[in-house]
From Swiss-Prot:
Disulfide bonds: C94-C109, C101-C115, C108-C126, C112-C133, C117-C124
Domains: entry comment: The presence of a 'disulfide through disulfide knot' structurally defines this protein as a knottin.
A Pfam family matched in the record: Agouti
Stretches for region Disordered: 56-95
Glycosylation sites: N39
Function: Involved in the regulation of melanogenesis. The binding of ASP to MC1R precludes alpha-MSH initiated signaling and thus blocks production of cAMP, leading to a down-regulation of eumelanogenesis (brown/black pigment) and thus increasing synthesis of pheomelanin (yellow/red pigment).
PANTHER family named among the record's database cross-references: AGOUTI RELATED, AGOUTI-SIGNALING PROTEIN
Biological processes, Gene Ontology terms: hormone-mediated signaling pathway; melanin biosynthetic process; melanosome organization
Protein name in UniProt: Agouti-signaling protein
Length: 133
């Protein structure tokens, strides 16, 4: 009995370590020192060298002026025209917003509203979800 419990405990501990090791992120896994040295030396050689060029005051002013000229047209946008949408007239027998609208009832009066049912279609009401419709 004790041997089987010891075997089960050992198996459980091994499974815990196995699951913990398999869920480690790739960068957290232990690496070889040789792999680290090879990767770091290759990465440095892959990138081209960078040359630093000093700008004089005149070129700075020109580039600043060019940037301001580019910004000005982008800021001036044509204002959005609010086009009044003509809504269709509501149907003659209709249900007002927030009133009960069970399926045999007529449609909602507001064209942007729809009949929303809850609790297995026991409580239905006309609702407007998009006020800018």
């Amino acid at each position: 009995m004790d041997v089987s419990r010891l075997l089960l405990a050992t198996l459980l501990v091994c499974l815990c370590f196995l699951t913990a090791y398999s869920h480690l992120a790739p960068e957290e896994k232990p690496r070889d020192e040789r792999n680290l040295k090879n990767n770091s030396s290759m990465n440095l050689l892959d990138f081209p060298s960078v040359s630093i060029v000093a700008l004089n005051k005149k070129s700075k002013k020109i580039s600043r002026n060019e940037a301001e000229k580019k910004k000005r047209p982008s800021k001036r946008k044509a204002p959005m025209k609010n086009v009044a949408r003509t809504r269709p007239p509501p149907p003659t027998p209709c249900v007002a917003t927030r009133d009960s609208c069970k399926p045999p009832a007529p449609a909602c009066c507001d064209p942007c509203a729809f009949c929303q049912c809850r609790f297995f279609r026991s409580a239905c009401s006309c609702r407007v979800l998009n006020p800018t419709c």
